[in-house]
C-alpha cells in the first residue's frame, strides 16, 4: 500500500510519537537531505544527492531512511507567494507520489516558500563564497525546511493541538 501524502499536521498524526524524520529540498539537479534526532528537536544536514534517475534517487533516500531509522518524510512544497502551486510544486507532488509507491513511511508536505532564499542570505551574511554556497545550499535548505516543520509541530504540541 502506498504511503500517505498529507499536509504536515495530518502526516504528523500518522508518524509514531518518537523517531527521526527526513527533510527533503527537491531541486531539478539535486536533493538536499536533512534528518532530525529521534525526539524531533534538531535537524542536521546529511548530504546533497546529485539527481540521476528517480529509481537511483529513491534508492539512496530509502537507504538513508534505513540507516537513520526514519519514520517519516517532510518534503518541502514550493508554494508561490500568492499561495498557488506552480510547475515546481506539481513536480514535487509527482515525486512524492512516485516515492509513496516505494515506501510506507508517511510523507508530510511543508510550505517551503523562500527557504532557499533565506538560506542563501544567511550564507552570504556568513561570507561564504559563491562556489561554497553552491555546494551546501541544498542541504542547508533541507535543514531549514525540516527545522521549520519540527518547530511548528513542537508549537502545536505545546499548545495542545
Curated annotation (Swiss-Prot):
Biological process (GO), any one: rRNA 5'-end processing
Keywords, ordered alphabetically: Cytoplasm, Hydrolase, Nuclease, Ribosome biogenesis
Superkingdom in the source lineage: Bacteria
Primary enzyme class: hydrolase
Gene3D superfamilies assigned to the protein according to its UniProt record, in alphabetical order: YqgF/RNase H-like domain (3.30.420.140)
EC number: 3.1.-.-
Pfam families named in the record: RuvX
Annotated GO MF terms: nuclease activity
Entry's Gene Ontology cellular component terms: cytosol
Compartments in which it is found: Cytoplasm
Major location (coarse): cytoplasm
UniProt entry tagged with the keyword Transcription regulation: no
PANTHER family: POLYNUCLEOTIDYL TRANSFERASE, RIBONUCLEASE H-LIKE SUPERFAMILY PROTEIN
Function: Could be a nuclease involved in processing of the 5'-end of pre-16S rRNA.
NCBIfam families the UniProt entry points to: RNAse_H_YqgF (TIGR00250)
UniProt family annotation: Belongs to the YqgF nuclease family.
HAMAP family, sorted: Nuclease_YqgF (MF_00651)
Protein name stated in the entry: Putative pre-16S rRNA nuclease
Amino acid at each position: 500500500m502506498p504511503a500517505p501524502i498529507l499536509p504536515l499536521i495530518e502526516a504528523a498524526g500518522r508518524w509514531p510519537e518518537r523517531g527521526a524524520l527526513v527533510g527533503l529540498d527537491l531541486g531539478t539537479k539535486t536533493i538536499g537531505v536533512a534528518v532530525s534526532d529521534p525526539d524531533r528537536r534538531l535537524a542536521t544536514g546529511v548530504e546533497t544527492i546529485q539527481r540521476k534517475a528517480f529509481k537511483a534517487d529513491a534508492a539512496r533516500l530509502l537507504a538513508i531512511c534505513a540507516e537513520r531509522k526514519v519514520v517519516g518524510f517532510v518534503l518541502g512544497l514550493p508554494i508561490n507567494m500568492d499561495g498557488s502551486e506552480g510547475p515546481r510544486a506539481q513536480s514535487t507532488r509527482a515525486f512524492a507520489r512516485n516515492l509513496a509507491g516505494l515506501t510506507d513511511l508517511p510523507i508530510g508536505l511543508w510550505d517551503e516558500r523562500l527557504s532557499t532564499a533565506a538560506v542563501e542570505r544567511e550564507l552570504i551574511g556568513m561570507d561564504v563564497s559563491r562556489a561554497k554556497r553552491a555546494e551546501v545550499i541544498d542541504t542547508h535548505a533541507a535543514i531549514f525546511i525540516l527545522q521549520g516543520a519540527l518547530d511548528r509541530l513542537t508549537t502545536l504540541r505545546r499548545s495542545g493541538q
